[in-house]
Amino acid sequence: MRQRLLYLLRFYLLTVLTFIAAKIVFMLCHAADHPFSASDVLEVISHGVSLDLSTALYFLIVPFLLTVASLWLRLPRWLFVGYYVLIAVAFVLAFVSDTSLYAFWQFKLDASWLSYLETPTEAMASVTVGYLLLRLFLTMVLTAALTMLYIRIAGMPSYGHHSWREVLLDVVFIPLLVIGIRGGFGESTTNIGQVYYSQNQFLNHSAVNPVFSFLYSMSHQMDDLSQYQSMDDSLCSQLLEGVYTTESVAADTLLNTTRPNVLIILLESAGEQFATVMPHLQQLKKEGVSFSRCYANSWRTDRGTVSILSGYPSFPKISVMKMPEKSRTLPSIALSLQKRGYQTSYLYGGDINFTNMRSYLIGTGWSRLTSMDDFTLEQRHTSQWGVRDDITFNTLYEEIVKCALRSDEDGGKYLWGYSTLSSHEPWDVPQKTLDDEVENAFAYLDNCLYDFICRLRQTPQWENLLIVLTADHGIVYKDIDNTQPLQKNHVPMLWLGGAVREPRVVSRFCNQSDLAATLLGQLQLPHADFTFSRDVLSATYVHPTAVNNYSNAQWLVDSTGQILYDFDVRQSSISHSTDAERLLRLNKAILQVTTNDLKNR
């Protein structure tokens, strides 16, 4: 038993050390373009090791199974050597490819390089024969060297007998292996974003394990997007004419300044279906600009967050936030304001590594992140998902007042983002005002929000502040489900603060994703790169629509009615429109054009 454990431990540690060595070599190879210090190397290793530990466990599965089999069978030596050769080839190919391609791509190895195999001539056109031969030579030498290391250090397991203790050990080892691969017991599973820690993207990229990066992107491929191709692209363009207009022309003016400090709050799951238990929010609507027919783009926080902050559409079966190679190409409100001198920060009281949130936020211009790890141990466990909302609202208040005081001194501008989390299963909140636990959680959120607004209103910083309130998505609750999309997907969109010129209601159909263009239009800033975000107040917004998708279905509403099309069964489950055929074609065209854009990023 002891010898088997030592064998698995030797194999595992050698794999982890190989990954760490690859990080150091990667950094050294790019030192000329990306200088770093010795402390940077240590930080890259310390932040990246969690991903290395989990990735190494994937490759421990085969040795573990072989050692189990060896209790009953005398396995030939070539089985182990063959596996060592196989993983050595895989590792070295990943390391060499990653290190070589980074100079061209400036992002980590992912599955996108496979597309170049279809046109190898074009792929090799930008490099010399010597360049290729050198890398081929290095691959062969390093593969041989790594194989020898596995043979000499990991070696071969000794053969044992299938005693009950040996079998029990194997049974216990299996869940430990699964937990390690998953990344622990938390809500967040192992993902690339967990190793991001710096505003220097090179250091973040250095921390990422290239083998994991490739496997992760392979598991999030978009091969099934072909099912959304239903017509010629020229017909799509014709159908979409006037639907996605990016210009701000003669836009109505909502603000009394073009350079306010901006706060964007994403209210967890707080769809309009909970309006009756959120009376304070309804009162606030009378004091600001309420977009009364705003609809969520999707049904999950990761997708809604991207739609709100990047003005980008969501997709039925894909989360763009979970695809760093795609999300890093997106525009964002933060990037646009950062270019105008705004300092940006984001607060989320939960695990910011969940669904790759960290890498998305850093990659789209949010300079300073605050998450549950920045709170006390006691505060981190005040909610199932992390730090409960009354605590984080207070943290946000203190941050705004502190930053605004600095702004008064140096004239700087600020953009804050904040995601609440308590109004989510299991609905564990400290107050008990309603018997229904779900409604009680939203009443708690309503109280937290109102207390925050009242406190902020008493500060001098209120005068130049624009607060944008919206929900990340709606939820299925009681009799409101996916068969009632008008109710389920309806979310608040409210602009508040001293920067708002006067209260009013904007009653046009719109999506969360239209916030980016509408806000930047009000700030008189360009937003042409937000291809699918529309300035709702612009004279060019002549065809108001809203879209939402979930699972493998997409819903569309405009002035003629609504339609919900299920791509699994290839038929509409809802079709209530005076122009149903046109609306169906438009619905398909929207998804075809947006998925084409995603594939090309």
Task: Please give the residue ranges for each predicted region.
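Residues that form generic nucleotide/phosphate-binding pockets
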Residues: 48, 52, 126, 152-153, ...
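Soluble catalytic regions of membrane-associated enzymes that act on cell-envelope
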Residues: 186-530, 540-541
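Membrane-interface soluble catalytic domains
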Residues: 190, 499-601
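Short, Lys/Arg-enriched, disordered terminal segments
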Residues: 1-7, 405-410, 599-601
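Short clusters of hydrophobic/aromatic residues that line enzyme substrate/ligand-binding pockets
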Residues: 123, 427, 536
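Transmembrane and membrane-interface helices of multi-pass
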Residues: 2-223
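Short secondary-structure junctions
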Residues: 159-161, 368-369, 543-547
